[in-house]
Amino acid sequence: MRIRLISVGGRMPGWAAEGYREYAQRLGGGISLELVEIPLGRRGKGADPRRALDEEGRRMLKALGDEQVVALDVRGKAWDTPALARELDGWLHDGRDLALLVGGPDGLHPDCLARAERRWSLSPLTFPHMLVRVLLAEQLYRAWSLLQGHPYHRA
């Protein structure tokens, strides 16, 4: 199964790219994790943040194919590790690839949220999108290792 992490934002700093790559490469069992970067909409002095969000939403929806879609959203469902492992198992058995949507500074466009089959909250805290990429890769690896009986997850 291919998991595409579709995230608003640009290149990751070295520490984030290294962390993301480490966990993405550890995934096995026919799972690949691919990063799709959506350019930030124009923001700044005099710019309309709604217009930036609209641009990001259009680009994100255009990047989607016929795959399961899960939106990362603070108002989504929070899963502990065993629950995430069950979700991953369900996604694996669905037969479709998976897209995880991560918004930019203003979150996800309402149309992206509407397109999502599920909403997942990593935490009630707000994280920088670069850190979210690393957290997602690690949590997916942790859930996969739990499904495989691998000793990485020891809770």
Curated annotation (Swiss-Prot):
Keyword Nucleotide-binding among record annotations: no
Location of this chain's protein in the cell: Cytoplasm
EC number annotated for this UniProt entry: 2.1.1.177
Disulfide bridge positions per record: none
Pfam families (UniProt xref): SPOUT_MTase
GO CC, alphabetical: cytoplasm
A GO molecular-function descriptor: rRNA (pseudouridine-N3-)-methyltransferase activity
Chief place where the protein resides: cytoplasm
Residues at which S-adenosyl-L-methionine binds: 72, 103, 122-127
Keyword set, alphabetical order: Cytoplasm, Methyltransferase, rRNA processing, S-adenosyl-L-methionine, Transferase
Catalysed reactions listed for this entry: pseudouridine(1915) in 23S rRNA + S-adenosyl-L-methionine = N(3)-methylpseudouridine(1915) in 23S rRNA + S-adenosyl-L-homocysteine + H(+)
Domain of life from the UniProt record: Bacteria
Primary role: Specifically methylates the pseudouridine at position 1915 (m3Psi1915) in 23S rRNA.
Family: Belongs to the RNA methyltransferase RlmH family.
Quaternary organization: Homodimer.
Protein name, entry field: Ribosomal RNA large subunit methyltransferase H
